Amino acid sequence: MAELVFFQDWPWQHWASHRPEAVALITDIEPLTWEQLNQRVMRLAYHFTQQGLRDGQTVVLRGKNSVELLLSQLATLYCGAKVLPLNPRLPESLLAELLPHLNIDFAIDFDDGLLAKFTYPILAVSERAVTAHEWEHHLPHFSHAKTQPATLILTSGSTGLPKAAVHNVLAHLDSANGVLQAMDYQQHDCWLLSLPLFHVSGQGILWRWLLRGAQLAIRSTPLIEALQTVTHASLVPTQLWRLLNQTETLSLSLKQVLLGGATIPTALTDLASHRGIDCWSGYGMTEMASTVCAKRADGKKGVGLPLKGKQLRLVEGEIQVRSQSQAMGYWFDGKMMPLKTTEGWFKTNDRGAYIDDEYHVIGRLDNLFISGGECVQPEDIEAVINNHPAVSQSFIIPIDDVEFGQRPVAVIEFSDKCELDTIKGWLKGKLAPFQYPAHFFLLENSLKGSGIKVSRQQVKNWVLQQPDLIQSKENSGL
């Protein structure tokens, strides 16, 4: 495949040279031009090198989205180092188990200072004026750095210890290019950084901005308020519903929304279209640096077709993908562990189908279970439950059963006031008997603290500890 990147320098340097006075970053205080952004990144990188940061090292970057966190990521990359953006809500016990395997050299903590408990040197974030530029000659040139490991993004997978997927700059730019070949995002447009940089979807926003040389907004204001001043955003359906309902009498600047994370009701996309907002849905993953397939949301369950530069195939029902945006591997104990591939095709472990001229994602292969001789795909049941207007998300967990082998249990989060008994009645006739959950539970807040995607394994562990199930097992002799 031909190289897509036209940059001879880092993207922010390129735009500082070609469009120095154009607005690059919208903040709570004042906008930054590309020239101002470049100067701030350069000063920060200088002070990082003065503290010992070198080419090839790794910096863990912990915190919520902020201007300082964004600049720290760019400055780290400018130094030729790898950046590991870290969710500040990950528990200390998990970090103690995970971080020693990721060969951390320095840490930056914009949250509560938890990283100070570990042994990593803390990088001070300083932007004092730099008078000499000779130090820049010691940094790796972009032509070299763009193919080297740049980011370690923890997989938001549903089970087990997160893996650190490694991407270089070219992979991120390839991913951005694929999305921007489909979505209209011009240099005068502004995309809200509405998703965290520790998640691949947040990185996707960042690299689309850098590739296009457009505007990025980082706001500390409430989401609904922040959305009223931008043209593009990445949201889940519940957030878009709230925006449309709370701004019925206002004119919105929002033009394009990339939706994910849940079933997308036709009523929502119709209402958005009436307000002048185009909605997009798709399919992506950490290992592919975000989006693989995308389409204009049309109320159908499919995810569309592969974006430019992406390939997708079905092998015995499994979705396999291939692209230049593919991760270099997983970083573990100082080594690059290979992805699970066949001739370059990444095995996603997702079940898929090609129906009515588009691809459909049916569910995870490892989620399938047998109940009374019937194959049960949890995502099929979850899709039905999620169609209820009060449901934000749901999980179907298999539990052992003496008669059926396994039975489904539903764990539900509501976006509006609703009772589990209401859902139980509403589901009657909408599911096959073997699909109907044997038990229903509300999703505990403690299970929602690890990022955008709730861990299915953690939900299962929690379910198995519930007194109702323990008593049921004792009565059945399991």
Regions found by a protein language model. Name each.
Residues F369, F395-D401, V409-E413, I423-L478:
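Conserved C-terminal "lid"/linker of ANL adenylate-forming enzymes
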Residues S323, R351-Q435:
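AMP-binding/adenylate-forming catalytic core of the ANL superfamily
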Residues Y46-L90, C375:
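Conserved AMP-binding/adenylate-forming
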Residues H232-L235, L243-K300, Q311:
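Gly/Ser/Thr-rich phosphate-binding loop
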Residues V5, P20, H133-L154, G160-L161, ...:
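Conserved pre-ATP/AMP-binding loop-to-beta segment of ANL
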Residues T33-E35, F142, A150-N177:
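Conserved AMP-binding A3 loop
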Residues L173-C190, L197-H232, P237-T238, R242, ...:
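Conserved AMP-binding/adenylation subdomain of ANL enzymes
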